[in-house]
Structures are given as C-alpha cells and as structure tokens.
C-alpha cells in the first residue's frame, strides 16, 4: 500500500499559522482520505486564529470570509482555514449564529460524522475524539450528536 504524504505546500500553510503562535490542524475529509491512503486536493485547516489573524498572515482572501472560513488556492489545492467555533441553530444550510472559541473540543462537537472529525497536526499525528478510526474499519457512518439534527442542519451531508 502506498503511503500518502501531506503535500509540502499544505505543511507550509500549517507552519505559517504555527509560527504566528496559533494552533493549526488538518481536519475532516482530507484526514479521512489520508487514513484511507487516498489523495485529496481539498484541505480544511482548523485553528484558534481569528479571521483577522489569518488575513494578517496570508493577506486578503479572494472570497469573502463567512462563518470564520478563509479560502485560498495553492496550485491545484483548495485550502479552507476556519477558526474554531461553536454553532447554534441552523437557518437552511447555515448556522444562525457562530461563536469563535479557543477550544478544539468545542469545535469538534459541530462536526457531522465521526469519520470527518479527525484532527491531524503538522507531524501527521491524529486526534480521534469520536472513535472514527473504528468506524472506518467497520465501514460505518456515525453522526456526532443527534443524527436527525445533523441531517436537518444540512441535508447534503448524506450525499457527501
């Protein structure tokens, strides 16, 4: 089996955030794909840096920052950098209110499924708060929190 490595360009993004005194983790589907030895061109980074801090580090984004998410392209890679946050009730597919937090555990609570809630640091060490690795081995998709609520928040989650 071929070992997939995190692209150098993505590690450089993590390094810039870390060098500025903030936490930075790859999170979500890219980490899941990494564990399954699949390549990804989409990378999500979770950090305790606020959107204004991210703009200071990387400059203005070509997209408007919404919900604490900063988007950038590096070659063929799409990178979303999102501030740790808590979300309140949804209006359509988006939360009615978000609150930034310094707490990775609170950020993890808003994730949809256990197999998308992995956090991986720059050294490729994985934090698995919800036993997602077991779910991957069992080929099981399990919601974090109430499954009905998770699907109602964003019905497209079922398709992704």
Task: Locate the predicted segments by residue.
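Catalytic cores of the polymerase beta-like nucleotidyltransferase superfamily
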Residues: 1-160
């Amino acid at each position: 089996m071929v070992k997939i490595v995190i692209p150098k360009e993505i590690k450089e993004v993590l390094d810039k955030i870390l060098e500025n005194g903030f936490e930075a983790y790859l999170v979500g589907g890219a980490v899941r794909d990494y564990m399954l030895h699949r390549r990804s061109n989409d990378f999500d980074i979770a950090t305790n840096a606020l959107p204004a801090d991210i703009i200071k580090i990387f400059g203005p984004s070509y997209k408007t920052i919404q919900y604490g998410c900063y988007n950038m392209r590096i070659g063929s890679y799409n990178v979303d950098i999102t501030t740790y946050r808590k979300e309140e009730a949804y209006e359509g597919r988006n939360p009615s209110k978000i609150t930034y937090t310094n707490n990775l555990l609170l950020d993890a609570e808003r994730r949809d499924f256990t197999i998308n809630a992995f956090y991986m640091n720059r050294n490729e060490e994985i934090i698995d708060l919800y036993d997602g690795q077991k779910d991957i081995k069992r080929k099981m998709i399990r919601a974090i929190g109430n499954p009905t609520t998770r699907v109602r928040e964003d019905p497209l989650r079922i398709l992704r």
